[in-house]
Amino acid sequence: MPFEQTQLFCDEKQTILKKIDTRNEIPDTIKSIPIPKISEAGFHYEPKNVNICLPKINIPNEILMKHEVEKYRKLFQSKPQTARKSVSVRTVSCAKGCAQRCESERAEDEAGKMCAKILNFTCSKCQDRTQYSPNDLQKHFEMWHHGELPSFPCEMCSFSASDFQIFKQHRKTHRNTFVKCDICNSERSYTLLDLTKHFTSKHCVNGNFQCEECRFFTQDVGTFVQHIHRHKEVHYKCGKCHHLCFTKGELQKHLRVHSGTLPFTCHYCSYGAIHKDQLVRHVITLHKEHLYAKEKLERDQYDKRVAKTTTGLKLILKRYKIGPTKTFWKRKTIASGNDESIGKNAQAFNIVSKTQTKSEDQSQEQLNEEKGGRQHCEDGDKPIESGSEKATVLSTGQCNKADEGASAPSSVLSAVQGPTVLLVRNNKITIPANYSAKFMGFKMVDGRQHIVIKLLPANKQILPSPALQPNTEKESTANLPPQAMDNTGFATGLTAMNDTDFVKAAPLSCSSPELPRKVISEKETAFISEKNNMLQMVDDSKSVTSLPTPSESVTSVRLTTKVEARDNVDLWENPSTQSHPDLIGTSINSPDKVNLTIRPNAYSCGDMHNYCINYVNSELPAESSNCFEFSNQGSLPFHNYSKVNNKRRRFSRGAVCENLQRESSNKTVTQQSTSDSDTTSPLRKESSNSDSLLASISPLSGTLKIKTEIEEPCDLEETQNFNEQSLFTNENQNLLNMTEEPKWDDIPCAGSPMMPRITSVFSLQSEQASEFLPPEVNQLLQDTLKPRSDIKEDSNNIPSKNLPLDCDQTLKKSKEEVIKSSKDFQMQDIISVPSASVGVNVPANDLNLKCNGQEKQALSVLQDVRDPGVTTKIPSIITLLKTQSDAIITQQLVKDKLRTTTQHSGPVYVQNPLLTSEQKNPVFVQTPKGFIIPLHVANKPGLHVFSGRPVPLVNTQSVPAALLVNKKPGVVLTVNNGKPEGVPTVKTENVHSYGTVTKEPCRTPFLKAEHNRYCLTPGLCSSIGSCVNMKTCSENTLPLKGSYIIKTSVSSSVKAVPFANVLPEQQGPNVNVLDAVKQQNESLPKASLYTLMPDGKQAVFFKCMMPNNTKLLKPRLVQNSTYQRIQPKRPAGAPQKILLKIFNPVLSMSAVNNLSVGNSASSFQKEIVPSKPTVHGEQKVPQSSRDALPVSVQDLMPANEAVLSSTAACPGSSEEPVHISERSETRVSRSKANCTIERNFNKRKTCKNKFAKIKTRISQDSETAFVSRNRSCKRKYIDNYQEPPRKKSATHRKCKERANAEDVQETFGFSRPRLPKDSGRTLRLFPFNSEQLVKCPRRNQPVVVLNHPDADAPEVERVMKTITKFNGRVLKVSLSKATINALLKPVSITSETTYSDFSKRHKMLKPVNSVKERFVLKLTLKKTSKNNYQIVKTTSEDVLKSKFNCWFCGRVFDNQDVWAGHGQRHLVEATKDWNMLE
């Protein structure tokens, strides 16, 4: 007795059917029974009557409850991967092939002892080399070798045991035996126990073992290992693309992709397809009107032949009691028709239902046959040669002859040549004279054993088609529920089999309305159930689907199976498409009328039913007919519709409708028909010679196959499987007209613009960082680009003539407004953005809809414009875009429909760029308060920063500040009152853009340029601390009030990571972001510390980075009659480097006095120049753009200390020019006074590493005392200063390094006392990892401070050590009181008490007691036993995983649940003090 139901028609070793003439071997108990000779090619039958004796199989009669049925079902179907012993047909050639395979496997057994393998055993009695699991072998012996014990031999030695537990104990003695992992393919050997741990830790993701070569996954390590060995078997490899196929049929199907020809063409248009099912979908979707006309003609012909048929279709309704009050109806499957279907898992199992009572033996036992000529997934390598093979569907039952005769004229009959009754009695099957039988095996249905026998006709006979009565159309239409008629859109007889002859599929407009889930009303069902409470045949006079009036009854009316469309929320973008669907899914209306009673309440209880539908004789356009077969087992509840998994699919513009996936009905419906040997339909003759369309839904995988079969045998293998499972909603759910009412309920709303977008956290996107930005910003960031845009089409978008939009009209519209785009909103219009690399790309909006809890992503497909008229306009369009005025560009920014939040409500003036004589150089102009900087490149590759009150406000427009947002991808910095709110970096594919800044600066100079000279002049922005290398290019720039110029080397080498975004036409300066990983090892304060702000405001993630300079360049002073400038030596052709950075001014003060700890070989040269009325007295020249960061604010801009120290208290500062010469003498005197203290301090070495050698040169114009003091201090610098700390000791020494840096700074007297915690600061913002997608949080998003410079307490350092130890697994840290007190304790130490209190202060910072923290770790646990768990590590790095990026901190997650929870914690922190945020 087989104990587990296997995939009988998919298992390679069990059901491979060879085409050659062989004698079927039935093993064991039925070997002595004569077996008919079957030739599948000719089907010549030799014996007339064959009796097949089958062993009696007893199944308990008590299996009536659902849980018992499920228990037996699981018993028989627990492991489909393992071959089972069953009474099945085995060809000799198959046995030989298996023997050869086993020989090759035996040759590998020597090496197999050193590799992982699952415990499989063969039967020592049968000796047929069939592999069994230990439980299966035990069951096999109990069934076939009763009274004997199985043998479990050890593969590592000669030990053998009859009990598996003893065998397991023996295997423990081989624990030291080393084996290898087949997945890793490494030379490392494991013990058996270690190998199990290795599989669990390395190759298990969330408790699932997933195959890297296919989509198979399981939770059982043994099944997983066995599956891996399957990939090592003989494969069929494509010679062109090295694609591997497991069967020859799959290979032949794959080879058609490389043929380049379109063997299937549409009869109504020029459409061509590679596969037949694609052509079927095309015809159904676009040429319904032709099918309607053809249907009308065929219907008239059928009505004339109705009276000639004498046989009818019978239904056997079986009533089961599951529970006290629930009544289920099971429809026995009867199939008939032209069967040449091929494909994976596309089978119709015919089941013999064995009844328990003698009265039911004759009437209820039925044989459901496999259709003749069906090939299975393993046998797909050879086609069926016979194009007209017919499978016979036989029904048994005791029929009321009188009722049958009375109802014969009014019944729909399906005449089938062959036996009318197939009796199964006493385990003997009587085969008719004109049929041969093939035993296929057993099948478990509802806990009962069913015999599957395939009947093959002896000769090629044409089966007649059914005939219909003229009055059935009206009756069947009248019996339709009102819902069904309203939603289906057919005038008469929507689902009547006599009315429709072709496949009706969804037109895919808007959404998919659902077909009626039942054909009869509740009253009718109740009426039928009362009259059929006993298991009996339903008379034709009392039809299931007809009203309870015997005179008006029709035996088989119509079939409306609710087959929902795969894309049930997709929209047509083609306006010419039919706006309302006439029929959704795949509603097959065949001439054979079928009585269908579907009780959804029965399915809601999960009862397993077997329904099979075989549709015949539905003709499709141009002499082609359809044969639809629907079969399934194990129905699913109707209300599980929300669990439909929508998968991503790509569609090309030319053949979108080809790949539309249709979900099959998960219910199988029965059509029982009795054959009539006297009548023959001409339609059947036509269908045997013409092309036919076959759509079959597999019972095992629920896949839909639509095939067009022609006479070429090779074309029979082109069935395309869509592994989608159709789940059905509840019966009570109303059928909505989704045409007018699209499903936008599941689409997340945009959220309030005044708050951070919470909905973005839970977007199921992992494509790019731009997806985490709000749609308004994302559209703005991409509007001004000219990239290679991909056309994003909706998955059911059918190509239309209007798809390549008129680019001229679109561009004219784009000048005036920016079309708002949103993935999370509804579909907008299509805008076209020309690119220099491609002709014209029309980016449709990336529609992102949530379909029943699952978000569906429309994949972008590159679209080539085929319209020559549009292509010729491309150069002029590009020129137009490049030459359009900056006023129009500004209008696009202003007129955009954005509702962004800014903290200042006053008007902000947008200054347009100035046209300069030198077009290739960027312009930097002073930016006073109230001006925004539109860094736009228009017809010039330079970067333009325009602002300043002295500029004539001719093109300046005053707009609300809430409407302004930066429009370019790259670094977007929003500065409100001197505080950076967020700097997100958008990464797009193959697109480069320029980093831009949008700010409302303070009154201090932001960027200053000079007149009449071309020099590299990086200015210092006191409000945000950005150091930018820039180049003045105009002699007519704004008048300057005086500026300090820090000369930097253009040719200095800076290790930097360029922006991912750069405009294609940009050829000017390159924006570079320093490598975070590199600087993390070279930064002064590098630990990520966690601080708490007492004022309740949000903290910020900061990386205090110190740049590294590699080349020294001496300054060149140029005297001028008016003022003094510095010009660098610029090599010919050297590109300009522009470095946009945010830094901590307090940190920079200590860094400049420490002379850049992060620079291993840096040397600063101070040039003290005599003060002049218009010239600043002190010039400081770092050697590269990175050296401009640590410039002390007091050295350059002492008047702006208030702004730098606390921007919250002083949002604006003086507009007067900075004169450092006024403070130079004071600074010299302070250096004299503190030089002795510095010497004494240098004697106390706090770190072991040496600082870099620093050369300090003082100009001759400075005082000699200051020079001598500095020279004497230089030796102490060399001895005392460290090199950048190493990676291992970086965290340990951070506190000491900062203590040194701050004390040296305070010793010289350059620094002020530390500011209290509650004062706001402008700190440096830098990502953790330069490779992460989200560099910085989006604007208006809360940030968390980790390494605040004032929070270097050892308590926090201990926390960070723990975080580093767990390598990113820490989700939450609960700080103890000691740590919180250390963070909140204000430090205010003056320069007078620095030295005296240094040792005491340093000791105070050391922890007295151990700090206890609580860490919530992210660990994936796998349950090993009842209460034991073990940590499951991630899979190998080469396995492709889904990534989920946190839009707050940029952290990357591979688990969606963990990512969502992580975002929730950010949101809780963001909204904790919501009323306090301003």
Swiss-Prot record:
Residues 670-681 have a biased composition (Low complexity). PROSITE patterns: ZINC_FINGER_C2H2_1 (PS00028), ZINC_FINGER_C2H2_2 (PS50157). One of its GO terms (cellular component) is nucleus. Coiled coil: none annotated. A zinc finger (C2H2-type) spans 152-174, 209-231, 236-258, 264-287, 1444-1466. GO terms for molecular function: DNA binding; DNA-binding transcription factor activity, RNA polymerase II-specific; zinc ion binding. One of its GO terms (biological process) is chromatin organization. This is Zinc finger protein 518A. Its main location: nucleus. The gene is Znf518a. It is found in: Nucleus. Belongs to the krueppel C2H2-type zinc-finger protein family.
